[in-house]
């Protein structure tokens, strides 16, 4: 497989991977579709700095000019931030088209996992994963993120599944595909903006060292899939359960009324929830990404010792 034909690994990232040093992958959809410019660029650079401060090398992943980038420069992050939603939100089905056309794409959880794995990066920090959408029993709207977690051996550190989803069905899907769902310091699945969901994770894990040991064992056992680490949003940034659920219900009703579906759904719902919560949800979103970056870097450092 002539991967290097399309893959560009940043020198710092390549050096770290080759030397067994800790590296953390980051997605780029959060830059293009997750928040407005210039806040998106500032946040992305802050996340990279948090990873450095915790001893690891950050690798922001994107598709630029048909090249799969494992590690972006500040200029490339700035470019993605300015382009915003004009950049294609790229899932697995888009990769070949974007590469063949020499086009740009912002990576979702799915494509970030794929490109991280190609580049030899084992850990990836994000905000929240996609999952089974509410009403999926009639729409079949299930995020490709879940399929990637079933097939690609990368640890994904997130704040749970986005609470706009059907969390029960999302957990069922992950169980069917053999993906372990670990709760960092919690038995309860966090729901992105809030620390509670009413659903249990498979196992509570309390230290980065144990997270690393579990991932290492999975690798040694030759298990093909990924692993989901759910890290609750810090208490002080957590939103009121009732407030956020009310906003989500309203946002879903608006999406249905406007006939919004497919990959436009999540950006629409997140923007609507932000509007309904007076921007509080965006602040929470930024803080939980910082928190996940910290844990991912600490876990990557522990993994590099094994």
Model-derived segments and their meaning:
Residues 15-18, 23-24, 53, 115-118, ...:
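Solvent-exposed alpha-helices and their adjacent loops that cap or buttress functional pockets
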Residues 28, 33-35, 41-98, 220-236:
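Glycine-rich nucleotide/cofactor/substrate-binding loop typically near the N-terminus or early
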Residues 108-109, 137-150, 154-175, 209-213:
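Active-site glycine-rich loop that binds ribose-phosphate moieties when present
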């Amino acid at each position: 497989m002539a991967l290097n034909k399309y893959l560009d690994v940043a020198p710092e990232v390549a050096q770290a991977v080759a030397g067994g040093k800790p590296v953390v992958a980051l997605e780029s959809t959060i830059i293009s579709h997750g928040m407005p410019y210039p806040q998106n660029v500032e946040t992305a650079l802050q996340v990279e700095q948090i990873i450095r401060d915790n001893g690891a090398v950050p690798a922001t992943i994107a598709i630029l000019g048909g090249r799969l980038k494992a590690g972006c420069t500040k200029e490339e992050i700035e470019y993605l931030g300015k382009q915003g939603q004009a950049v294609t939100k790229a899932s697995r089905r888009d990769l070949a088209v974007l590469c063949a056309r020499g086009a740009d794409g912002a990576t979702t959880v799915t494509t970030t996992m794929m490109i991280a794995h190609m580049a030899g990066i084992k850990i990836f920090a994000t905000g929240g994963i996609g999952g089974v959408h509410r009403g999926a029993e009639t729409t079949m709207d299930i995020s490709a993120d879940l399929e990637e977690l079933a097939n690609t051996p990368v640890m994904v550190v997130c704040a749970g599944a986005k609470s706009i989803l059907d969390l029960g069905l999302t957990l069922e899907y992950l169980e069917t595909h053999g993906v372990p769902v670990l709760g960092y310091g919690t038995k309860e699945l966090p729901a992105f903006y809030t620390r509670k969901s009413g659903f249990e994770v498979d196992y509570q894990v309390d230290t980065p060292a144990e997270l690393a040991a579990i991932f290492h064992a999975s690798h040694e056992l030759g298990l093909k899939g990924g692993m989901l680490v759910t890290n609750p949003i810090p208490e002080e940034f957590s939103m009121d359960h009732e407030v956020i659920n009310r906003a989500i219900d309203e946002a879903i009703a608006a999406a249905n009324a406007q006939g919004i579906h497919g990959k436009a759904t999540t950006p629409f719902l997140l923007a609507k929830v932000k509007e309904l919560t007076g921007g509080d949800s965006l602040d929470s979103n930024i803080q939980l990404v910082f928190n996940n970056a910290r844990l991912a870097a600490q876990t990557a450092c522990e993994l590099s010792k094994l």
